[in-house]
Structures are given as C-alpha cells and as structure tokens.
Regions:
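A gly/proline- and charged-residue-enriched helix-loop-helix capping module
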Residues: 68-109
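A conserved beta-strand-loop-helix scaffold within acyl/acetyltransferase catalytic domains
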Residues: 2-48, 53-62, 107-241
C-alpha cells in the first residue's frame, strides 16, 4: 500500500536504506540532499519503505504544488524491486489532491505509457559507460573533442584534484552568472553546502584545470553513488574557452575511471551546444519523463505557459 507521509513523520533511516538498496538509487533522493535543496518535501511510501517517492513542494498564496528543485535533475519513484509502468502509475495516482499543481521529473527507470495524460515532456541526459578500457572509450570521441584535448596539452594545461569548490563557483558566477543565469544568492549558498556535505560523505570528487602559468581555468564537481558519477556542476574562465581546459578535464576523469563499473552521467542539457559537447565524448542520450499535473481547472493557461517558460529557461541556463 502506498501512503502519504509528511516530512516530520518520515523514518529517515528507513528512507535512506531504501535509496541505498534501490535498483535505481540516486544521490538526489537521499534525505540529507533533499533537505538541503528543497524548500519543503513530503513523500509517498510503499509498505515499510519498499519503494518511495519524494514530493518537493512550495506554497504560493493558496496553492501547494510539487516542483523540481535546483541541483536535482531526476526524482520520481525509487524502488528496491523491479519497476514497471503500473508501479509508476500507482505512485502518481497516490499524490494527494492537496497538491493542486505539479511539474517535476521522473528518473530514467520510471516508465509510463506514451499516451499517459500526465506526461508533459521528456528530458534528456547523456551517459557514458566507463566499463571499457580507456583506448576503447577514446575511439568514441568526436574529432572536435580530440582537437580540444590536443590543444589543451599543447598549451600545457594540467589537471589536479587540489583546489577549492569556491573557485569553481566563482568562475561560474563571473562568467555564466553575468549572462543572466537565474541563480539567486541562496542557490550559490546551497550549492556550496551541497559540495562540502558530499565531500564529507565521500561522494564528491573535484577536478581542476590550470594553465601553464598556474592560473585557474576550469573545475568540475562530480557526485558519485550507485555505480554512477554525475557531473553536477562546472565553472570555467574565458581562458578555458581558448585552451580546451574543460575537454581535458573530462578526458582526464574518463581515463582515471576507465575499466571500472561506473557510468558517467553528464546530466544532459536543453542547450544544443552543450548537448553536442557531451556527445563528443561518446555519450548516449537517456530519456526521462517530465510530469505535469493540474488539479486547478480554473488556473489560466497563460499562467501555466509562463511558469513552463520560466522553468525551461532556468533549466537551460543552469546546465549551460
């Protein structure tokens, strides 16, 4: 039986045990991660935490709605047993009516019929299986990716794991942040706390690229759990655009992890240029479903359209 459980009544030890042992577990769904990223969250729980579904929510005036927090690409149902369309449908049907509106992402394991009325779109992430030897993985690189790596080596760019998360965040703020990326000051604080919490838990790896004159060029935050490494965040300077530092960073990480039972998840992007950059490393597209549920029949469609535009714009800019 699936029941609705308010945050204060969630057994967090059982919750995280479920995520630990889920066939589709992801670090996004751990209680500590949700506590740091979501304004508030409740949950749907099946039986004794056999399967769970987080419900991050906000309240605006009279309306309580489910939303997708920043720094979380996928949520949905996480289960200790094999998932199918019926399970996903049952969880969606169990979302209480007090949530008058919902717009959130499932994960790549959550299946639904193509004609399901709640499907509001499809998101894409890019994944690369690192189980193969480095030489084999390198063969999947595009010509442009190879050129960028060669350029970085010629310019004597070097990679290290020594550095501070603040350097990566600052590079993003000073470059992408100045181009209208809709990050509030709170978002940057949350990101910093997420990284340090992940480091404390042994889930975060940082990689930095420096120029031949020892100037910071680029950095990446990798989150690892459940045999998957997610490229959660990156930042780069204008110099990195000219010296191929970001390509070298990713190539270095692929070489480091090649032959291991790991999948590198680039976290996808709605930006065509960035998606092309990720595909340049031989990654493949993986689709996850976006769910939109409107239980407010008199909610004006223009308002919904405006909300969707803002959400998509934020997603594109965040992943850029």
């Amino acid at each position: 039986m699936i029941r609705y459980v308010r945050h204060d009544n969630i057994n967090f030890a059982k919750w995280d045990h479920c995520i630990d042992h889920s066939v589709n577990g992801m670090f996004y769904a751990y209680a500590w991660y949700l506590d740091m990223t979501a304004d508030s969250w409740d949950a749907l729980v099946e039986d004794d935490y056999r399967a769970v579904m987080p419900l991050p929510f906000r309240k605006k005036a009279w309306m309580k709605y489910v939303y997708q927090p920043f720094f979380i690409q996928q949520l949905g149902v996480f289960s200790t047993y094999r998932l199918n369309e019926e399970v996903t449908e049952h969880f969606l049907e169990a979302i209480p009516r007090e949530f008058r509106f919902a717009d959130f992402n499932l994960n790549t394991y959550n299946l639904l019929s193509d004609r399901h009325p709640s499907i509001g779109g499809r998101g894409v992430t890019h994944e690369l299986d690192l189980i193969f030897p480095y030489g084999h993985l390198q063969e999947g690189y595009s010509a442009n990716t190879r050129r960028n790596i060669k350029k970085a080596r010629a310019k004597e760019v070097f990679v290290t794991n020594a550095g501070r998360p603040e350097d990566i965040i600052l590079a993003f703020r000073q470059n992408r942040g100045k181009l209208g990326v809709p990050f509030a000051e709170k978002d940057y604080r949350v990101l910093k706390h997420l990284i340090y919490a992940g480091m404390h838990k042994g889930m975060v790896s940082l990689r930095f690229a420096y120029s031949s004159t020892n100037d910071f060029c680029a950095g990446i935050v990798f989150f690892r759990s459940h045999h998957k490494v997610v490229l959660l965040f990156s930042g780069s300077t204008p110099e990195a655009r000219n010296n191929g530092a970001m390509s070298l960073l990713i190539d270095h990480f692929i070489q480091e992890c090649a032959g291991k039972e790991l999948v590198l998840d680039f976290e996808g992007s709605a930006d065509p240029g960035l998606a092309r950059f990720y595909r340049g490393f031989g990654s493949e597209e993986c689709v996850f479903l976006r769910i939109i549920m409107n239980k407010v029949p008199f909610l004006p469609e223009p308002l919904l359209d405006g909300y969707r535009w803002i959400k998509n714009h934020c997603k594109q800019q965040k992943n850029a």
